[in-house]
């Protein structure tokens, strides 16, 4: 459906995208994930035809639409857009906003289906300021999907929503994508959005793709420390201390290969626990995080972050032995 081949782009001789290649299959939702300035929005603009690549090619539905010498105009690509601020016209009603999309008037039956599926029936005659942020978001999505675009591009579609509303709208978006078999590429810096909505993710850093894979692959087998840290606090253990670990990656500053162990993958054990490597040390701190206790354990080899659930009667200064359960 959408293919990037060795994309390079720069602004004022400053590289913004460096040798990025990936594809989005029909009916697939892919997220470009990373911090501000990593190149993800540039890739979205390249896909839209709003920028021309310095090198590389973009193919859409089997046709070359961009390379260093040409760019097919955005309005002829059959692409739908959903902007960060939704870009609704304040002086138009919900129905008028939806109908404003090019060719939307030719898809009345689809528009009615989308209105029902998105749960905005009854809001058609209201103006944007008369509906909630979540409802505005759904109106913008219906407008983007009304013309049956080949591809939907979304730029941080959930960034303006409060946490409670965000989760609800995220679930609705995911459901609507599946029901309409939407092919989508969306930009996000939020790992929860990416994990919940995407089939695959492209993790970006400094203009390069650090890792491309399914959400499970990226979570279970991060390519490096940067990717692993996207998911929150974690532990990096020298591979030699966890000989049974199957997945490791090259560490930083010449430290050799390391294994990532999530805080929840530790279990309390006796100092001798068969063949499993045991780490023993003194507890530096215990913090109540609500659903779990976060324990900082200083061992002879390294400092560990451990999440324990249940009735944890531990305090700073206590001795503790733990073993990593990488299957947890």
Where are these regions (language model features)?
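ABC ATPase nucleotide-binding domain helices that frame the ATP-binding cleft
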Residues: 41-44, 139
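Helix-to-loop junction immediately C-terminal to a conserved catalytic motif
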Residues: 48
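ABC ATPase NBD Q-loop/coupling interface
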Residues: 57-77
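Non-catalytic connector elements of ABC transporters
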Residues: 234, 245-328
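The feature captures the beta-strand-to-loop junction immediately N-terminal to the Walker
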Residues: 33-35
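ABC ATPase nucleotide-binding domains
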Residues: 74, 78-80, 84, 88-226
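Conserved coupling/switch loops of ABC nucleotide-binding domains, chiefly the family-specific signature
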Residues: 54-57, 206
């Amino acid at each position: 459906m959408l293919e990037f081949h060795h994309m390079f782009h720069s602004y004022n001789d400053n590289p913004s995208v460096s040798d990025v290649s990936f594809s989005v299959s029909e009916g697939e939702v892919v997220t470009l994930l990373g911090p501000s300035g990593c190149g993800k929005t540039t890739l979205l603009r390249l896909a839209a035809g709003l920028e021309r690549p310095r090198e590389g090619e973009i193919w859409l539905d089997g046709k070359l639409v961009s390379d260093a010498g040409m760019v097919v105009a955005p309005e002829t690509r059959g692409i739908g857009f959903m902007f960060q601020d939704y870009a609704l016209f304040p002086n138009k009603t919900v129905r008028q906003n939806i109908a404003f999309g090019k060719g939307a008037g030719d898809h009345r039956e689809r528009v009615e289906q989308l209105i029902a599926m998105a749960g905005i029936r009854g809001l058609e005659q209201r103006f944007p300021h008369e509906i909630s942020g979540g409802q505005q978001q759904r109106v913008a999505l219906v407008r983007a999907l009304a013309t049956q675009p080949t591809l939907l591009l979304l730029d941080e579609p959930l960034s303006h929503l409060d946490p409670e509303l965000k989760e609800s709208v995220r679930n609705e978006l995911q459901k609507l994508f599946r029901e309409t078999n939407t092919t989508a590429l969306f930009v996000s810096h939020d790992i929860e959005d990416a994990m919940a909505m995407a089939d695959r993710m492209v993790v970006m850093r400094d203009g390069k793709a650090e890792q491309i894979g399914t959400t499970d692959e990226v979570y279970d087998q991060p390519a490096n420390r940067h990717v692993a840290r996207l998911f929150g606090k974690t532990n990096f253990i020298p591979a030699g201390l966890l000989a049974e670990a199957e997945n490791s990656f090259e560490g930083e500053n010449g430290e050799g290969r390391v294994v990532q162990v999530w805080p929840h993958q530790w279990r309390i054990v006796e100092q001798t626990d068969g063949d499993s490597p045991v780490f023993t040390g003194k507890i530096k701190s215990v913090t109540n995080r609500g659903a779990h206790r976060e324990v900082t354990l200083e061992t002879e080899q390294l400092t560990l972050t451990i999440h324990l659930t249940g009735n944890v009667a531990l305090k700073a200064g206590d001795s503790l032995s733990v073993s990593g359960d990488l299957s947890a």
